[in-house]
Amino acid sequence: MSIFLCFLLLLPLSLIFLKKLLPSKGKLPPGPKGLPIIGNLHQFGRFLHKSLHKISQEYGPVMLLHFGVVPVIIVSSKEGAEEVLKTHDLETCSRPKTVGSGLFTYNFKDIGFAPYGENWREMRKIAVSELFSQKKLKSFRYIREDESQLLVRKVSKSALETPTSSVNLRKVIFTFAASIICRLSFGQNFCDFVDMETVEELVLESETNLGSLAFADFLPAGWIIDRISGQHSTVMKAFSKLTNFFELVIDDHLKSGKIEDHSDIISVMLDMINKPTEVGSYKVTDDHLKGLMSDVFLAGVNAGSITMIWTMTELSRHPRVMRKLQEEIRAALGPNKEKITEEDLEKVEYLKMVIEEAFRLHPPAPLLLPRLTMSDINIQGYSIPKNTMIQINTYTIGRDPKNWTKPDEFIPERFVDNPIEYKGQHFELLPFGAGRRVCPGMATGITIVELGLLSLLYFFDWSLPNGMTTKDIDMEEDGAFVIAKKVSLELVPTLHRW
């Protein structure tokens, strides 16, 4: 009843806001008519990307919807995405501010959600220099290979001790990805002193609240409803847990004297924080450190593990592809290898096609991080005013029959002699985005995915648990911002005999 009264009180304010938003200076995109106050929010189901996909089938690849009183442009075509991310990259490379993104990035002191400007440029410079440069990628190679060997040992132990028992691949793969990201970013392997189930819970809870829609984001005085509904309290609890975890990691660096060795991003930034700053120069603070930790920890851990799990899921559903892939891998690498190295990644072309096909059907973030126009622009013949939010639906683009034959089927061979790849130059496939706001950790992320999958597919043969068929594999999704497989993938590993 109290929430209903809030809506009644907000109605006059909402009507005033609607009159001021999106002044008509030209032809606006089409879209479904919304309701007072809530706009089109009532048309969204559990998964926003699927709801927008369905609406786009009626209204086209460039639509105008209202999230509450906030106008949002939805782009669902390769051509529209190219205009936003390439033609008008500079004019659209800022970010809208939301409650969740502001909180979990410590007031936008990160790279991913920071509005375009000095803070974003400086933070990106630090991240690229200390984490994502080619030099750093090579220097961290031993960490990735160490963890891939540990992954193989864990699965081997299970295969030998309980030959007919299944392995929960979500847990195994999450630990693999989290261990790599935490070692190369934070200089610590949390497996040694933190329960990985707790870490997984923390990542999922933080990401869910980061990607959740708050009433305050889309309604004037919506913060009142957030507090009455309990949304504000839920988000704050998740944020508090994440902050406590980060402070534990930072305190460990301070106690162990790691600041001086500059071996990881935390020690580098702590040194920057402690050094005197010249007048007029950029000042790095504790919030900048935590903001960057949030980006790396949440996006780095979850996106990589989710892609690996969806890939193994599709391979399990398509035994022909699994057989073909494993035959190619083993023929290319030869028998009885003791370990997989990153040189081996250049020998397995079909694996790269399989991963690209998984990206097409299961992009980790089916809606790219929203952009905000910094000037009036024109997209596909429609006028888009300054300060308008733009969402690009890569889920729809990846299933567009104009770009893909049999778009709903898992067919890695579609990438044979096909120039399309995932690095941001081809707008049919955008798992990492494109333009100035492309994911800076793309090379690191894809290397982790390829190395982990290659290790699992070279050393083990995989089968479904007894009595289960490919039709029984559950494909239900879960998540808010990053979309994971809801039901854990359970497979039976058998050490391959040569």
UniProtKB/Swiss-Prot annotation:
The keyword Heme applies. The keyword Transmembrane applies. Heme binds at residue 439. GO terms for molecular function: heme binding; iron ion binding; monooxygenase activity; oxidoreductase activity, acting on paired donors, with incorporation or reduction of molecular oxygen. Its EC number is 1.14.-.-. CDD domains: CYP71-like. One of its GO terms (cellular component) is membrane. Keywords: Heme, Iron, Membrane, Metal-binding, Monooxygenase, Oxidoreductase, Transmembrane, Transmembrane helix. InterPro entries: Cyt_P450 (IPR001128), Cyt_P450_CS (IPR017972), Cyt_P450_E_grp-I (IPR002401), Cyt_P450_sf (IPR036396), Cytochrome_P450_71 (IPR050193). PROSITE patterns: CYTOCHROME_P450. Its main location: membrane. The gene is CYP71B5. It is found in: Membrane. The chain crosses the membrane at residues 3-23. This is Cytochrome P450 71B5. It is a single-pass membrane protein. Gene3D superfamilies: Cytochrome P450. Its cofactor is heme. Belongs to the cytochrome P450 family. It is an enzyme of class 1 (oxidoreductase).
